[in-house]
């Protein structure tokens, strides 16, 4: 009897289990709530994209302008090649840390017309006007800024073989040869009246400023002078409509309008300090005063003609040449500032280029110091600085005051 009872119990139990697992209350894995760890186990693992390797040649991001820049700029000049050399940069930094110098002028567009660093300026890339010498311009700016050094970007404007090659329609033409005109050094120029040329150079200046350069220095902002002037045919400039001075004055104004708020400086011939005409190249120092923060006449004594101020060799008299030139310049700036008819957009100051190279005389420490002292003695303000030009980028340290 017990065996029969056990048999029925076993049958009932088996039927119950069968109904339990086949009922609508399904307890399969798919309906069991998952914990976070379970979600991770069940879900398909997504393999992350591999990190892009860091390009050792890549530059850092744009830099801010130097905080608290010096009120009186005392600069040395550097070619792009020197700026690309770690050893040379350390030389500049050491010179500045141990002397009164506090700024560096760096070539970003020299007489070749090529930009010295890679960039994304549309027309520059289109024209192939790049020769990378400075691989990391932003990093260079940071390195100099970290040392408290003011950094100026120098660019040649109308002397531009790279642009004349890409755009011969913008170039000065030779009447006799029916080719692109070149000066005595074999360098070609673009038409100073071309708005395309103006905009092209402004785009370059904007790029430099956006990278963190504290200032842009414009050189070769003039008409050509060294060559057969009678053989020049201008594709745009028309002497019947405008004088050369009017063209350059319009260009100066255009620069300021398109680079508002930027620190700008202009390199002018030294003779503009004493001449009342435009020297046949369109440069008149008074025209630069409304638009440039710093005007930089190149008062190299070796560049003055024999007989200047009674000197058979002006290069031997650096103090006299620089003092006389800067005194006349300062008098003209004072008259400009006192005029009630002038329109000023900036508080312009003089910051001349001085000679630190042997030409006409051996330029030792005494001659370097004489030029600097002449700048100070001629100025009516203590805010006048200077820039030293040494093509070798090797400077006469003893001509500078120690820190």
Question: Which positions does each model-derived feature cover?
Answer:
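N-terminal, intrinsically disordered, polar/charged segments of Gram-positive cell-envelope systems
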Residues: 25-71
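Active-site-adjacent "subsite" loops/lids of carbohydrate-active enzymes
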Residues: 64-75, 81-83, 158-210
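Aromatic-lined carbohydrate-recognition surfaces of secreted/lumenal glycan-active proteins
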Residues: 77, 150-160, 217-218, 224, ...
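Catalytic domains of carbohydrate-active enzymes, especially glycoside hydrolases
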Residues: 88-114, 210-215, 292-294, 375-386
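Glycine-rich, aromatic-flanked loop segments that form ligand/cofactor-binding clefts
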Residues: 103-108, 135-181, 217
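Conserved, mostly hydrophobic/aromatic
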Residues: 104, 144, 151, 201, ...
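Aromatic- and acidic-residue-enriched segments that line the glycan-binding/catalytic groove
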Residues: 116-128, 160-183, 224-239, 283
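Substrate-binding cleft of secreted/luminal carbohydrate-active enzymes
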Residues: 292-306, 315-403
